[in-house]
């Protein structure tokens, strides 16, 4: 009888190996994150009512250097004629996109450092919103301190990696119409990312797998694109705004700095860098001249003043609440901030800005013609009261740019597209100008951060740019007119519901969810197979036990293992999987809208809703011209 039984040492070894395999498989399953791991279940200070559907956390983009980008995603509240995702980036370089999320286009605004309120002009009405802190080291993102990026193509490569891994987690969004939006130095980031996406889409493997990303448009406000035209716009802008009188003693210092910049740009002979130290002195001279009794002009809104030398760094007023809120332990826990993030959130990272000084990258203005000709629509908008990235410089570089057989806003040789007056709810709002895939919008009486000043107008601009049409949905369209014409119906502040489009989206989400379950189930299957094999082995031994009285005596080490132990273990695994699936379903598959329960007026029915410390980086890398730090006379293009 003993010849039919495995030797005692083999039995012991099998048990140990089974244990090791189960532990390893369990660890792999636990470490492979899914969408449910990023689901935001509560948000401190949230307004009354159910929470918005959102996900947040880190995604690794550079394993070697521990590079992780932070994202915060808000699901759209309603679906109009098609599904869209807008990715928002702030600038700096090194300034957090939480500025955009909490002070501009996100669904929440801060009342104080512990209370949130709804933003009635939030961009998540008809589009999914994805905010990303990048490059690594910015905001909640992090990396080893010696691995910050230097060039725009490096940044774009990181971002494409981020998107690949984000879509693996959220496959239901991969085939959305994709738009990028942002402001200031994002005028450099976004065109480079767009080019990297178009290059990726040419990859044969991507084409074969039908994983093309449907990049439709770029929407950039008060962007930094072309140093030549934009540096040289400072002097004419201050003259136009009456900030300095021509030929005055105050003007002479600014004019000297302007002349030095012209000479430096001439010496570059077409090889102009994105950042030119000599030309930065023009803005510094303007701020110095404006200094009166310790107060200077706000470079982001020339109607305002600030203490010298901050000159706008303390603006907007919501900023004083932002850092205290985002450093709270309960907030970082809610947003799934990794423990590897050792320091508190800062608006702009001096170390990132000091490192990110592109020497090889050409200005993004050189990329725009190719993007336009490829079919990507581009919208540029300016707040008329911004100095640092003012509208004169933007308009000048547009007028010189050539693409699709024309120059600037030419409709035909010598015939330019007209500037069309825009009114919003009966008030003059600005003007539109369009030609050959490019749209330009000037917002009257607006600052560097247009959505902060006019959230609902900015959302109206977004809906027009995205081509949102609520004709088949219902709701009360906003009274927004260009040259007196209303155009496509869009809605701001009233939240209609989709029927057919919503049903199609539910089917899409259901298919994507089964795909996600299958993917995560591959790892779980390993655990089940191993457990089943172990159960079969012990079942065989139990039968031998019943057939021969010497079985238990020969293998006393197995006496404590009952027939129900492995099933109980497997059931514990299954219960955790069911809980994760329920969380995934709660975050991804809840009904988007409820027609019966909708109340009139603005609704939120689709809501399913650290202490700061000076780092060694900040000591070694003091704030520079591009950094937005209190108490510095810097020129941060946030």
Swiss-Prot record:
GO biological process: apoptotic process; proteolysis
Membrane-spanning residues: 520-540
One family name in Pfam for this protein: Peptidase_S10
Compartment(s) where it occurs, according to its Swiss-Prot or TrEMBL record: Golgi apparatus, trans-Golgi network membrane
Basic and acidic residues: bias regions: 590-599, 617-630
Reactions this protein catalyses: Preferential release of a C-terminal arginine or lysine residue
Protein name (record): Pheromone-processing carboxypeptidase KEX1
Encoding gene (name): KEX1
């Amino acid at each position: 009888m003993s010849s039919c039984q495995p030797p005692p040492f083999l039995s012991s070894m099998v048990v140990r190996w089974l244990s090791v395999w189960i532990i390893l498989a369990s660890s792999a399953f636990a470490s492979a994150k899914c969408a449910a791991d990023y689901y935001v279940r509560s948000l401190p200070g949230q307004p009354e009512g159910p929470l918005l559907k959102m996900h947040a956390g880190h995604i690794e983009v550079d394993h070697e250097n521990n590079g992780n980008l932070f994202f915060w995603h808000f699901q759209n509240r309603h679906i109009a004629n098609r599904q869209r995702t807008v990715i928002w980036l702030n600038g700096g370089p090194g300034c957090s996109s939480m500025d955009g999320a909490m002070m501009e286009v996100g669904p929440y605004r801060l009342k104080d450092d512990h209370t949130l309120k709804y933003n009635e002009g939030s961009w998540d009405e008809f589009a999914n919103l994805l905010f990303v802190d990048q490059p690594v080291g910015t905001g909640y993102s992090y990396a080893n301190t010696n691995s910050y990026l230097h060039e725009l193509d490096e940044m774009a490569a990181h971002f494409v990696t981020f998107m690949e891994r984000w879509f693996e987690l959220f496959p239901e969004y991969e085939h959305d119409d994709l738009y990028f939006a942002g402001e200031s130095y994002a005028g450099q980031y976004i065109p480079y990312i767009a080019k990297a996406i178009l290059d990726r889409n040419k990859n044969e493997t991507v084409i074969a797998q039908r994983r093309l990303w449907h990049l439709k448009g770029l929407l950039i406000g008060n962007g930094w694109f072309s140093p030549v035209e934009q540096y040289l716009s400072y002097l004419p802008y201050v003259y136009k705004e009456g900030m300095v009188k021509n030929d005055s003693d105050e003007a002479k210092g600014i004019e000297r700095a302007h002349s030095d910049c012209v000479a430096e740009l001439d010496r570059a002979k077409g090889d102009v860098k994105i950042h030119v130290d000599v030309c930065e002195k023009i803005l510094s001279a303007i701020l110095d001249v404006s200094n009166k009794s310790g107060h200077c002009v706000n470079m982001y809104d020339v109607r305002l003043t600030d203490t010298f030398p901050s000159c706008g760094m303390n603006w907007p007023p919501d900023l004083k609440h932002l850092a205290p809120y985002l450093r709270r332990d309960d907030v970082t826990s809610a947003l799934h901030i990794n423990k590897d993030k050792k320091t508190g959130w800062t608006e702009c990272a001096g170390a990132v800005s000091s490192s990110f000084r592109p020497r090889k990258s050409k200005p993004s203005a050189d990329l725009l013609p190719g993007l336009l000709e490829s079919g990507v629509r581009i919208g540029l908008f300016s707040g008329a009261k911004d100095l640092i990235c003012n509208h004169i410089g933007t308009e000048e570089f547009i007028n010189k740019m050539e693409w699709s057989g024309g120059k600037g806003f030419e409709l035909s040789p010598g015939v330019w597209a007209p500037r069309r007056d825009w009114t919003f709810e009966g008030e003059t709002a600005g003007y539109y100008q369009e030609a050959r895939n490019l749209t330009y919008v000037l917002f009257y009486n607006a600052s560097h951060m247009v959505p902060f000043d006019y959230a609902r107008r900015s959302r109206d601009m977004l809906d027009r740019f995205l081509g949102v049409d609520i004709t088949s949905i219902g709701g009360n369209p906003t009274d927004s007119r260009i040259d007196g014409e209303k155009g496509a119906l869009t809605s701001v502040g009233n939240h209609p519901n989709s029927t057919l489009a919503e049903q199609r989206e539910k089917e899409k989400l259901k298919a994507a969810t089964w795909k996600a379950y299958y993917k995560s189930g591959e790892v779980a299957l390993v655990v089940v197979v191993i457990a089943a094999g172990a159960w079969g082995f012990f079942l065989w031994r139990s039968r031998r036990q019943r057939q021969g009285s010497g079985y238990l005596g020969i293998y006393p080490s197995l006496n404590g293992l009952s027939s129900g132990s492995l099933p109980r273990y497997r059931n514990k695994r299954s219960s955790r999987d069911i809980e994760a699936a329920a969380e995934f379903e709660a975050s991804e598959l809840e009904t988007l809208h409820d027609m019966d329960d909708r109340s009139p007026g603005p609704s939120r029915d689709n809501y399913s809703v650290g202490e700061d410390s000076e780092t060694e980086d900040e000591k070694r890398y003091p704030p520079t011209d591009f950094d937005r730090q209190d108490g510095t006379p810097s020129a941060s293009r946030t």
